[in-house]
Amino acid sequence: MEKTEHKVLVANRGEIAVRIVQACRKLGLEFVCVHTAEDIHSGHVRIAKELGGEKSLYQVSSYHDANEILSVADDAGATAIHPGYGFFAEDFRFARRVTTRERKLIFIGPSWRVIRELGDKINTKRLARSLGVPTVPGSDRPIYDEMEAEKIAR
Protein backbone atom coordinates (compact mmCIF):
# COMPACT_ATOMS: atom_id res chain seq x y z
CA MET A 1 0.00 0.00 0.00
CA GLU A 2 1.37 3.40 -1.00
CA LYS A 3 1.88 5.96 1.76
CA THR A 4 0.01 9.23 1.26
CA GLU A 5 1.93 12.39 2.07
CA HIS A 6 -0.06 14.97 3.98
CA LYS A 7 0.36 18.65 4.69
CA VAL A 8 -1.60 20.03 7.64
CA LEU A 9 -2.83 23.60 7.78
CA VAL A 10 -2.82 24.76 11.41
CA ALA A 11 -5.86 27.04 11.65
CA ASN A 12 -5.21 28.43 15.11
CA ARG A 13 -2.71 30.38 17.17
CA GLY A 14 -0.85 30.27 20.46
CA GLU A 15 0.03 27.20 22.49
CA ILE A 16 -2.37 24.87 20.69
CA ALA A 17 -0.77 25.79 17.35
CA VAL A 18 2.69 25.16 18.83
CA ARG A 19 1.59 21.69 19.96
CA ILE A 20 0.05 20.87 16.58
CA VAL A 21 3.23 21.94 14.77
CA GLN A 22 5.33 19.80 17.13
CA ALA A 23 3.01 16.82 16.60
CA CYS A 24 3.22 17.24 12.82
CA ARG A 25 6.99 17.33 13.02
CA LYS A 26 7.08 14.24 15.25
CA LEU A 27 4.80 12.38 12.80
CA GLY A 28 6.83 13.47 9.79
CA LEU A 29 4.00 15.58 8.37
CA GLU A 30 4.47 18.84 6.54
CA PHE A 31 2.55 21.78 7.95
CA VAL A 32 1.66 25.38 7.29
CA CYS A 33 0.61 27.90 9.91
CA VAL A 34 -1.58 30.92 9.54
CA HIS A 35 -0.97 34.06 11.54
CA THR A 36 -2.19 37.63 11.69
CA ALA A 37 0.11 40.64 11.43
CA GLU A 38 -0.30 41.13 15.18
CA ASP A 39 0.95 37.59 15.88
CA ILE A 40 4.10 37.77 13.76
CA HIS A 41 6.33 37.44 16.85
CA SER A 42 4.23 34.84 18.68
CA GLY A 43 5.38 31.38 19.70
CA HIS A 44 3.55 29.43 17.02
CA VAL A 45 5.04 31.63 14.29
CA ARG A 46 8.56 31.28 15.73
CA ILE A 47 8.38 27.49 15.98
CA ALA A 48 6.76 27.13 12.56
CA LYS A 49 9.54 29.22 11.03
CA GLU A 50 12.19 27.26 12.95
CA LEU A 51 10.84 23.83 11.99
CA GLY A 52 9.38 24.56 8.57
CA GLY A 53 11.00 27.75 7.30
CA GLU A 54 9.31 30.80 5.77
CA LYS A 55 7.32 28.62 3.35
CA SER A 56 5.38 27.25 6.30
CA LEU A 57 3.88 30.65 7.21
CA TYR A 58 0.88 32.44 5.70
CA GLN A 59 -0.45 35.74 6.94
CA VAL A 60 -4.23 36.10 7.19
CA SER A 61 -6.38 39.04 8.17
CA SER A 62 -8.37 36.98 10.68
CA TYR A 63 -8.40 33.51 12.18
CA HIS A 64 -12.20 33.57 11.78
CA ASP A 65 -12.35 34.04 7.99
CA ALA A 66 -13.20 30.62 6.58
CA ASN A 67 -12.78 31.75 2.97
CA GLU A 68 -9.30 33.06 3.65
CA ILE A 69 -8.27 29.95 5.60
CA LEU A 70 -9.48 27.65 2.81
CA SER A 71 -7.75 29.82 0.21
CA VAL A 72 -4.48 29.45 2.12
CA ALA A 73 -5.05 25.68 2.32
CA ASP A 74 -5.41 25.57 -1.46
CA ASP A 75 -2.42 27.85 -2.11
CA ALA A 76 -0.22 25.86 0.27
CA GLY A 77 -1.31 22.48 -1.08
CA ALA A 78 -2.64 21.39 2.31
CA THR A 79 -4.43 18.06 2.46
CA ALA A 80 -5.79 18.51 5.99
CA ILE A 81 -6.87 21.24 8.40
CA HIS A 82 -6.37 21.07 12.14
CA PRO A 83 -8.60 23.66 13.84
CA GLY A 84 -7.03 23.40 17.29
CA TYR A 85 -9.77 24.45 19.71
CA GLY A 86 -12.23 27.31 19.63
CA PHE A 87 -12.45 29.15 16.31
CA PHE A 88 -13.41 26.46 13.79
CA ALA A 89 -13.14 23.43 16.09
CA GLU A 90 -16.73 23.94 17.22
CA ASP A 91 -18.15 25.12 13.89
CA PHE A 92 -19.89 22.22 12.17
CA ARG A 93 -20.49 24.35 9.06
CA PHE A 94 -16.75 24.86 8.62
CA ALA A 95 -15.97 21.16 9.18
CA ARG A 96 -18.68 20.21 6.68
CA ARG A 97 -17.37 22.71 4.14
CA VAL A 98 -13.79 21.43 4.51
CA THR A 99 -14.84 17.84 3.83
CA THR A 100 -17.49 18.33 1.15
CA ARG A 101 -16.11 21.05 -1.11
CA GLU A 102 -14.75 20.30 -4.57
CA ARG A 103 -11.15 20.08 -3.28
CA LYS A 104 -11.93 17.99 -0.22
CA LEU A 105 -9.61 18.19 2.77
CA ILE A 106 -9.32 16.09 5.89
CA PHE A 107 -10.79 17.81 8.95
CA ILE A 108 -8.70 16.71 11.92
CA GLY A 109 -11.32 16.39 14.62
CA PRO A 110 -14.82 15.04 15.03
CA SER A 111 -17.05 14.77 11.97
CA TRP A 112 -19.22 17.77 11.23
CA ARG A 113 -22.25 15.71 12.23
CA VAL A 114 -20.81 15.02 15.68
CA ILE A 115 -19.89 18.68 16.12
CA ARG A 116 -23.42 19.67 15.15
CA GLU A 117 -25.04 17.19 17.53
CA LEU A 118 -22.76 17.79 20.49
CA GLY A 119 -22.31 21.52 20.02
CA ASP A 120 -25.51 22.20 21.90
CA LYS A 121 -24.80 21.51 25.58
CA ILE A 122 -28.44 20.81 26.44
CA ASN A 123 -28.82 18.26 23.63
CA THR A 124 -25.50 16.72 24.63
CA LYS A 125 -26.65 16.34 28.22
CA ARG A 126 -29.92 14.76 27.08
CA LEU A 127 -28.04 12.35 24.84
CA ALA A 128 -25.62 11.42 27.63
CA ARG A 129 -28.48 10.71 30.02
CA SER A 130 -30.31 8.63 27.41
CA LEU A 131 -27.19 6.48 27.10
CA GLY A 132 -26.87 6.08 30.86
CA VAL A 133 -23.88 8.39 31.16
CA PRO A 134 -23.86 10.27 34.49
CA THR A 135 -24.21 14.04 34.15
CA VAL A 136 -23.91 16.93 36.57
CA PRO A 137 -27.14 18.06 38.19
CA GLY A 138 -28.95 20.92 36.53
CA SER A 139 -31.49 21.77 33.92
CA ASP A 140 -32.27 19.94 30.70
CA ARG A 141 -33.62 23.09 29.10
CA PRO A 142 -32.55 26.71 28.63
CA ILE A 143 -33.00 28.94 31.67
CA TYR A 144 -33.96 32.53 31.00
CA ASP A 145 -34.94 33.60 34.51
CA GLU A 146 -32.31 34.50 37.11
CA MET A 147 -34.44 33.29 40.02
CA GLU A 148 -34.94 29.89 38.41
CA ALA A 149 -31.20 29.61 37.76
CA GLU A 150 -30.46 30.30 41.43
CA LYS A 151 -33.04 27.71 42.49
CA ILE A 152 -31.49 25.04 40.24
CA ALA A 153 -27.98 25.93 41.44
CA ARG A 154 -28.93 25.17 45.07
Predicted regions and their residues:
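N-terminal beta-alpha lobe that positions the nucleotide/phosphoryl donor
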Residues: M1-R154
